[in-house]
């Protein structure tokens, strides 16, 4: 009897992949579920971005394989993005690598730096893909705690007490998902010092810095960060392009070359039209477009999400940023999944239970802001009917 590889038994199907099947079944039964669970922007990219894609797609010479390193136009635009938003200088030819989405980049970075058995630090709570990929690759996972009473920042005193002799990578994610916590400049400085002291590569995942955030930051702003850090960024959230699969990593020339060596043996560059349109998106993202799409629209939706949290008697930090709202459930609920299942089946609204992000999320729920205002208002009214009766 044919059996799958051992690594398949080490992981589970992604929570949202499983849960969306259930939601689809409920919708097929006429339940009309409103999903406030996934962070997939529902707004379109700019018109200029779409026009550029169509223009290139109509060019009969634009449909061949593209270089894995990415076309110069895209890498130059990505370097310009870092200069504009973070005032960080990057060499577009050697310090930027385009990705076909951040998920594949997590795989490529881990392959480039870790042998089986090497140790990796992963935040709890944190993005589940960090854990899944390291399970697939056979690294040793060590979780470090993020806690609300510490502003969801790393506890460096606790980290220093660990045996770090076999740690190769440390994953961080600021602005944080799922908590919305924002790294202070001091946090980034401590991370760089920690990496230098222990010969660890810190990988900061930074796709949310432009969402509901008036002061975008990058770990690359810290002197010396480029020598010991890698940063992910993405157009999925900031430019409303999740399905386009356009992301990037920035670091020093050597680290980028190692990652490119892995990546070049796995895939090619994405369609030329996507690369040129992504470059156009970064170039035409005016302050007005950014403020309307990444601040004002999400601010209205955030107000509605806060009302939902209040109906559920959940506590939340009003200073969190990003496209989610993270809230702590009250003690009257024994289990967060019982609560989200009640909301799903009685209010017909799909919210995310925090336990999927780690044990430190088991008393929390997450509301996505990626739904039209009208849908969010309907979701609020449905939840009121169930929980205020």
Which stretches of residues belong to each language-model region?
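PLP-dependent class I/II
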Residues: 2-4, 9-14, 19, 23-34, ...
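Conserved N-terminal alpha-helix of the aminotransferase class I/II PLP-enzyme fold
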Residues: 65-100
């Amino acid at each position: 009897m044919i059996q799958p590889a051992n690594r398949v038994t080490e992981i589970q199907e992604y929570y949202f992949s499983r849960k969306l099947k259930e939601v689809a079944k409920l919708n097929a039964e006429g339940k009309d579920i409103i999903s406030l669970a996934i962070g997939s922007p529902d707004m379109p990219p700019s018109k200029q971005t779409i026009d550029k894609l169509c223009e290139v797609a109509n060019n009969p010479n634009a449909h061949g394989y593209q270089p894995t390193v990415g076309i110069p136009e895209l890498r130059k635009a990505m370097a310009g993005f870092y200069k504009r938003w973070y005032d960080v200088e990057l060499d577009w030819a050697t310090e930027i690598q385009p990705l076909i989405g951040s998920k594949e980049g997590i795989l490529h970075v881990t392959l480039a730096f870790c042998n089986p058995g090497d140790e990796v630090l992963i935040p709890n709570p944190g993005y589940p893909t960090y854990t899944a990929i390291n399970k697939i690759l056979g690294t040793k996972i060590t979780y470090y705690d993020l806690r609300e009473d510490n502003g969801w920042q790393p506890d460096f005193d606790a980290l220093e007490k660990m045996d770090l002799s076999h740690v190769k990578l440390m994953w961080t994610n600021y602005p944080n998902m799922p908590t919305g916590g924002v790294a202070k400049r001091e946090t980034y400085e401590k991370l760089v010092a920690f990496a230098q002291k222990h010969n660890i590569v810190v990988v900061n995942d930074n796709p949310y810095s432009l969402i509901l955030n008036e002061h975008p930051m990058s770990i690359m702003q810290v002197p010396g960060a480029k020598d010991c850090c890698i940063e992910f960024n993405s157009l999925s959230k900031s430019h409303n392009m999740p399905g386009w699969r356009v992301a990037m990593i920035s670091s020093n020339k050597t680290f980028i070359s190692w990652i490119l060596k892995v990546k070049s043996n796995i895939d090619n560059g994405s369609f030329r039209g996507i690369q040129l349109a992504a470059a156009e998106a970064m170039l035409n993202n005016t302050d007005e477009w950014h403020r309307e799409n990444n601040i004002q629209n999400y601010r209205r939706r955030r107000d509605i999400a806060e009302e939902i949290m209040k109906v559920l008697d959940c506590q939340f930090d009003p200073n969190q940023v990003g496209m989610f709202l993270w809230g702590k459930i009250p003690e009257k609920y024994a289990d967060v999944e019982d609560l989200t299942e009640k909301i799903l089946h009685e209010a017909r609204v799909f919210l995310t239970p925090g336990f999927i992000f780690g044990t430190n999320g088991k008393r929390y729920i997450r509301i996505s802001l990626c739904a039209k205002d009208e849908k969010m208002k309907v979701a609020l009214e449905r939840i009121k009917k169930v929980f205020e009766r």
